[in-house]
Amino acid sequence: MRKAFTRIRLRNNRYAAYIIGFSFLAVSIILGISCGSLHIPIPAVFRVFWHQGFGGSIGSDDPMYTNIMMNIRLPRVVLAALVGAALSIAGAAFQGLLKNPLADPYTLGVSSGASVGAVVTLFLGLHLPVIGGFTLPVLSVAAALATMAAVLFFSRLVHASMSVSTLILTGVITNSFLGAFISLIIALTGDNLLPIVHWLLGSVSMRGWSYVILFLPFFLLGTILLIINGRELNVMTYGEDKAKLLGVSVQQRKMMILIAGSLLTGSAVAVSGTIGFVGLVIPHITRLLWGTDHRHLLPLSALLGAGFLVLADLLSRTIIEPIELPIGIITSLAGAPVFALILIRQHRGGRSL
């Protein structure tokens, strides 16, 4: 009874939910900046931030700390936070739209399209003169957008209203086909396999501010589009017919949500590789803590996902120093048992996911 009462209080206190979410993200960012092969004391972290923002004197060690923080750790932490937020909010939106608790950002196959773009770039050693070092993420984003267009076109071709089942099956077909294409390239790669495998397992290392700047427009556009559709997502979870009766332009809103979620997913995969379980588990945890209202579920999922991926990246580079593990390994090792516990908890409580 007490647990149920506590859960109801958490769900009804939205201010507390956002305070917890922002606090979790802030603590994760500070830890992500402070911890590493060279430990930066937390007071020094705040001094450097203060100096960057307002000027003033700094300690004798702070110039070194400033260089490490601003050029290495902070862009890495910011990119991890943005990718985690993007995957989580896209996962929450797809689970609501498709009415499928097992849906995640990769359901529609857009991530496979982004992966094909990256793998082909690595396999052929492409380096376009106009975009230089941005060749891989730019071509990956382009492949993701092309895949999204193909999935939506095929879904509409099969079923004019793009039913949920049609979208899911189209995603399965796309994932299978593009996954086979990736496997073919891997089989043909030979001894130069490591860069492709490392990219596919996900990482935010050695990215820098340029990757943050490249990803940020897609993140802002996709996130804003999803959040402004929170009320419509609430209505559409009860069925498209009821949503139409309540005045929701179902096809227009569905297309907007699909495009926004696909933009977030494709661009996230383009800059970080494939990172599993974030977009599947984080929305379930958020829903369990603070309810199913998408007006709050979406931004709260983004906050928790951002903090989670920052901590996962921290573990990936510190748990077996000096070896740095791909971040996708950490998220899968952490996400799989957590999702299993959520599943057991829900079924013991007599509720479905």
From Swiss-Prot:
Membrane-spanning intervals of the chain: 16-36, 77-97, 106-128, 140-160, 167-187, 208-228, 263-283, 296-316, 323-343
SUPFAM superfamilies, sorted: ABC transporter involved in vitamin B12 uptake, BtuC
Keyword Transmembrane helix: yes
CC terms in the record's Gene Ontology section: plasma membrane
Keywords attached to this entry: Cell membrane, Membrane, Transmembrane, Transmembrane helix, Transport
Subcellular compartments: Cell membrane
GO molecular function, one term: transmembrane transporter activity
Coiled coil: none
Function description: Probably part of an ABC transporter complex. Probably responsible for the translocation of the substrate across the membrane.
PANTHER family: ABC TRANSPORTER PERMEASE PROTEIN MJ0876-RELATED, FERRIC ENTEROBACTIN TRANSPORT SYSTEM PERMEASE PROTEIN
Protein name: Uncharacterized ABC transporter permease protein YvrB
Organism: Bacillus subtilis (strain 168)
Gene that this sequence comes from: yvrB
